[in-house]
Swiss-Prot record:
Molecular-function GO terms, alphabetical: ATP binding; glycine-tRNA ligase activity; protein dimerization activity
The family this protein is said to belong to: Belongs to the class-II aminoacyl-tRNA synthetase family.
Gene3D superfamilies: Anticodon-binding domain (3.40.50.800), Bira Bifunctional Protein, Domain 2 (3.30.930.10)
Species this chain originates from: Treponema denticola (strain ATCC 35405 / DSM 14222 / CIP 103919 / JCM 8153 / KCTC 15104)
Protein's UniProt name: Glycine--tRNA ligase
One Gene Ontology term from the biological process aspect of the record: glycyl-tRNA aminoacylation
Binding, ATP: 183-185, 193-198, 267-268, 312-315
Broad enzyme group: ligase
Catalysed reactions listed for this entry: tRNA(Gly) + glycine + ATP = glycyl-tRNA(Gly) + AMP + diphosphate
Lineage: Bacteria, Pseudomonadati, Spirochaetota, Spirochaetia, Spirochaetales
Swiss-Prot/TrEMBL keywords: Aminoacyl-tRNA synthetase, ATP-binding, Cytoplasm, Ligase, Nucleotide-binding, Protein biosynthesis
Pfam families found in the cross-reference section: HGTP_anticodon (PF03129), tRNA-synt_2b (PF00587)
SUPFAM superfamilies linked: Class II aaRS ABD-related, Class II aaRS and biotin synthetases
Subcellular location: Cytoplasm
Designated gene of the protein: glyQS
Amino acid sequence: MEDHKISMEKIVSLCKRRGFVFQSSEIYGGQNGAWDYGPLGIELKNNVSRAWWKEMTQLHDNIVGLDAAILMHPRTWEASGHVENFTDPLVDCKKCKSRFRADHLPPENLEKRVCPDCGGELTDTRKFNLMFKTHIGPTDDNSSVIYLRPETAQGIYVNYKNIIQSNRMKIPFGIAQIGKAFRNEIVTKNFIFRTCEFEQMEMQFFVKPGTDDEWFDYWKKQRWAFYEKYGVRTNKLQWHQHGKDELAHYAKDAYDIEYEFPMGFKELEGVHNRTNYDLTRHTEYSGKDMQYIDQDNGNEKYIPYIIETSAGLTRNVLMFICDAYDEEKVADKGNDDDWRTVLRFHPNIAPITVAVLPLMKKDGLAELAEEIRNELKEEFKTDYDQSGAIGKRYRRQDEVGTPFCVTVDYDSKEDNTVTLRFRDSMEQVRIPRTELISRIKTEIKNYKRAH
């Protein structure tokens, strides 16, 4: 597609039609800001999380994983500053009852207190805490208040000493976590980009003070390289450094990797130098010593600085779909049937790796195709489709991003060969059935996006 311009409407339509994402509770009219991941969506989401997890805990010897509880002691959120500071400015329209983030309104509307929807009068701005508050146990008084975690990072900080002791970790080292977080957003919008329930992929890297700038630069490079590795077009990515007015209260420096979504450049992932703020606060509030003892350097004691990489998993899913989406003219016959919709996922990200397609259902081709699929599914996520013309079946696989199709025809019965089709180029090669698995693995290893 020229300049790769797409609309969010096309993305949403494709996601629902092909089983990537559905509106939550749709039969009841839908729950605003909540989404369910369908058969292809969950495969895509799992592949993105596996790629990130491999990058962190497998390719780095000094990073380990954690799965902390969603419900944490409420003092955690007092120490982190969330109870006091995790707020957005809120205004209401007295007439139409719409709610707005004050900092997202046009300045003239906010200054004149005029609703942008109906022209009614806006209320004064007030702070709105984004944490979901609930109660634990049989009572619902202040003693039973608990929060759904608004971020996964604090679960890492409170386990930092446990992991040092149990895994004999030495600084510098990191702790990675993928998990759900919850924020009572004033406005949820742009499909799965901003929702109240979402998943984060966060890594907290503990370093000696004075080395933090060096590690900050290292992780900036690492995180940019991750998106390049999985085929994201770098002309759609940019860095945004937080100005002094944007920096969080705990941050020494912060950069966002932004992606050009249909609604413009928006944050995809943040790399933050959180200094020793979090561990210092948890020391104060818990009474526990969070200092690191450097046994290799004369038992020197210090509270580590933390370099954080924080990405939204669900936001990454949207990014990979948007970045992969393409519409391509495949013939010059002057009608709409000559266009195909294709998702150009990296093969390691694609929800289906290979589809097996018998040319016909009869004459034993379907049975042979099932045999081949059974061989392939030991190695790859596979699909099987025997309905309709072969060209339409190719198009269906293109639309969900399947990088390889294997066609089983009458020659396959005679000489034990199959046709391997490539999604991006639509080229086809004839290869022996016995070489199919090794050829697909080689193609995945050497994959380079051409569009």
